[in-house]
């Protein structure tokens, strides 16, 4: 019996990204003198694929949720919204990275091609409805980033960070795959919808292999998210990688990892909510505690922001573990806004790193207000937002998660989260103090950057303020996704 051909239209944007990645790779080989062409081709690709994704979802004849490739790929509101934010995040990451990479002679074509391929893994992961596509998307996301971390071949720390990232990433993938194999063995299916039905129909005491599989899946996901106690790679990789790569891996992949949690736990195993709820509580508390307390003692701003990301992913998990639509939407809002804030923070680190100078220490930001008041103001907005100061978006995101916790009577966890947030505010305010109340060392060069970079960092900083004052549209979007 001949098999029915899959409908390729829902996956056309992903195919377009793959095609353009190959075109840009060839362009980089044959047009070596005009080294900016790969950059502009990449940015045009991101604009076109965002428009194509929105057009296919909005104006095609599909229902609100459509499956293709034998139920392995799904196009729904959740996937479309997250894809658009991934495209936006990568677009800004490439703007910030261009001058930094050119100054350090980091291979530009390879950087953009690997970035696009990693982004292809992210969007494939977001649209996964099968354990096979979840794993393939995750590996396509991860493998290019291992190479990107080690791209700065003249820097030993970069190569070392790439090796660490690869080895620990391989362990995480192995754990995740082992967990998936147990789930497949217990349910006889790779389809997440079918797995959910099989898990609901099976009394847990008759099939303990499901719980073992769940433990390995949660551990693998925690590794990929960089949450405690599986966080050991995060500070070393963030510090050792070129700042342009740190910027990339600290933003869009977090959105894709959030989507992986939703697909695996919410779509695939809702009947095991009690079990994964308890695991996520432990992971979230450890992440908030270790992340915030370890960040306090850091003098390297990239390590500080790395520990900060561990804490923020802990806050995001608080929304997921609520097990309610409101909690999932709050976690989605938190992930998107954290990605925006992280873009701005690492964007400033990249912007300050000029002429072979690496702005990696907190003291390198000393006197920034006297050197460039506008950039200091943008950095202050971003840092205060990360700290959760009203009326910035970081405050709104934290309030959303706390509200979701209180609604499910987890008041003790909400109080704990507030206490950790107070601890976390210290290390952000310390950077602001250095920028505004300490004088700049005389040897520091003037801050010069392109108009494109200034516009990007200004939009980034003002977006943090604007969404904080008018969060309703993004909250509505997050609720619509569920």
From Swiss-Prot:
Topological relation to the membrane, as annotated: Multi-pass membrane protein
GO process annotations (BP): ATP synthesis coupled electron transport
Subcellular location: Cell inner membrane
Transmembrane segments: 11-31, 37-57, 77-97, 106-126, 131-151, 166-186, 208-228, 255-275, 279-299, 304-324, 332-352, 376-396, 404-424, 462-482
EC number(s) recorded for this UniProt protein: 7.1.1.-
Top EC category: translocase
Name by which UniProt lists this protein: NADH-quinone oxidoreductase subunit N
